[in-house]
């Protein structure tokens, strides 16, 4: 993040102070000098208190570091350890405070791995469900999938005007194909190939005046099967 002109001026002002007090040998001045530019407070915004406390604890080692020589890249590496963070910005407020603004990743579904519940983040990471309050409005996702496969599938659905909030359950199969169950209990079976076209067909059927059945089966090439169960 680039420093504004005003902030650069402030930095130069404090540097001049640092140069001045560095030349003073008085004992009290030495104590003052040693403490003036140490990080005394780290302010975190953008997350709830539970996560804020966790992050603050991990950033504790940056306190009492000289703010001029504290490299933001080192702070960035520490923030990257938290897989629920999507974006962040770091700002030094001289003489002794850090401001860190965080943006959480968007949660797009829930799944289970090794019998433990995880949220799926739009940042392509699995996030322990213990990090957040229960999210009941997310689709449950079953199967051994890679997150990038899920993200690509969601992108295709959104490109074809599917409302992801209407999806209740998602199933991924070893054959690399998807089934979805909507909140109205409509099951849509997609093929493993030509997925984009199949999604278009499914959306057209849903948007048509035809009375919807229970199943739209698109697994067989050039066939559309609509049935009651």
Label each region the model flagged.
Residues 1-229:
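Charged, solvent-exposed interaction patches on well-folded alpha/beta domains
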């Amino acid at each position: 993040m680039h420093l504004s002109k005003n902030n650069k001026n402030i930095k130069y002002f404090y540097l001049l102070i640092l140069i001045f007090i560095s030349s003073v040998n008085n004992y009290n001045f030495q104590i003052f000098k040693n403490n003036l530019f140490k990080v005394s407070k780290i302010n975190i915004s953008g997350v709830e208190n539970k996560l804020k406390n966790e992050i603050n604890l991990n950033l504790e080692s940056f306190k009492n570091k000289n703010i001029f020589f504290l490299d933001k890249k080192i702070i960035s590496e520490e923030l990257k350890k938290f897989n629920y963070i999507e974006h962040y910005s770091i700002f030094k407020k001289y003489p002794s405070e850090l401001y860190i603004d965080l943006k959480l990743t968007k949660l797009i579904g829930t799944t289970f791995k090794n019998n433990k519940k995880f949220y799926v983040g739009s940042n392509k990471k699995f996030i322990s469900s213990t990090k957040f309050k229960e999210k009941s409005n997310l689709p449950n996702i079953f199967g051994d999938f890679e997150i990038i496969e899920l993200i690509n599938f969601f992108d295709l659905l959104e490109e074809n005007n599917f409302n992801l909030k209407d999806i209740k359950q998602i199933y991924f199969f070893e054959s690399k194909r998807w089934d979805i169950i909507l909140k109205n209990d409509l099951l849509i079976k997609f093929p493993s190939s030509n997925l984009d076209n199949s999604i278009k067909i499914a959306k057209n059927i849903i948007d048509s005046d035809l009375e919807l059945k229970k199943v739209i089966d698109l697994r067989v090439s050039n066939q559309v099967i609509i049935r009651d169960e």
